[in-house]
Amino acid sequence: FGPNSTPIPPYKIAGLPFSNYVKLALDYRPLYRINENNKLAARADFGIAVPYWNSVVNPYVKQFYVGGPYDIRAFPIRKMGPGAYFPYDVIDNNAVPKLEDQTADIKIVMSLEYRFKIIAVLQGALFCDVGNIWTINEDEFRPGAKFNFSTFLNQMAVGPGAGLRIDLNYFIFRFDWAYPLYDPGIDGPQGQAFAKEGVILPEKRPVFNFAIGYPF
C-alpha cells in the first residue's frame, strides 16, 4: 500500500477539514442444520477502509476493531491488535495494558460454532474465533501494526471457548467463556522479545462474555 497524496493544507468546509475514504465490509454467515437439536454456524468477516486525497487516516469511528461478545470473544473489546503490535506499557518490569482503544484499517475475523440443545430452554455451544486488525500504512507509534501478506496468518489471534444459552424465544441470553490460546501481542515476536528481557507478561486468562442474542 502506498502513501496518500493529501493536499497541504487539507481542504475545509465551514472551517473544518473533511475526510475522504473508501470502506468495504463483507460479512458471510452460513448456518448448517445437522438435525433438530444440533447446528453448525460459521462466519467470515472482512473489512477494509482506505483514506485518500484529503485524508491520511480514516475517521476514528469508521475504523475496525476486534474483541468483545460479538467478535473474538477471548479478548476484551478494542484491546487487541493491530497486527503483531504489543499493546502494553512496561512499568516496573511489568507489562500493563494500554488504556487507549486499538483500531485499524483492515479486519479479518472467522468463527466456527457448534450449537446443541441440552434440555428445555438451555442450549450449549463450542466455538473458536480467529482474526485480527491491521493498519494499511506504517504506524510509528504501533510497530508491527501494518498488514503484510507474508506475516498476517501468524498474527491471527485464536480464541476457543464454550457457552451456555437460555432461549426464551423472543430473547436469547448468552454466556460465553473463551480463552486467548494465541495472542499475537503476547505470543508474537514483540511480546517474546520483552519476555527474554525479563519483563513479566500478563497471565492469559479466560474471558467471560454476557450478551443478548447469538454472536452471528
What would you call each of these model-derived segments?
Residues D129-G131, I136, G161, R165, ...:
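Flexible, small/polar- and glycine-enriched "cap/hinge" segments at structural transition points
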Residues N20, M156, K204:
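Short acidic-hydrophobic sequence patches enriched in Asp/Glu that either
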Residues L40-A44, G124-C128, A162, F173-F175, ...:
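Transmembrane beta-strands of outer-membrane beta-barrel proteins
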Residues V96-P97, D187-E203:
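Surface-exposed intrinsically disordered loops and tails
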Residues E140-L168, A195:
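Strand-loop-strand
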Residues F1-F116, L126-F149:
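C-terminal outer-membrane beta-barrel translocator/porin domains of Gram-negative envelope proteins
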Residues I166-Y170, P202-F216:
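Outer-membrane beta-barrel "beta-signal"
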Residues Y32-E36, F116-A120, D167-Y170, F216:
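Outer-membrane beta-barrel strand-turn architecture
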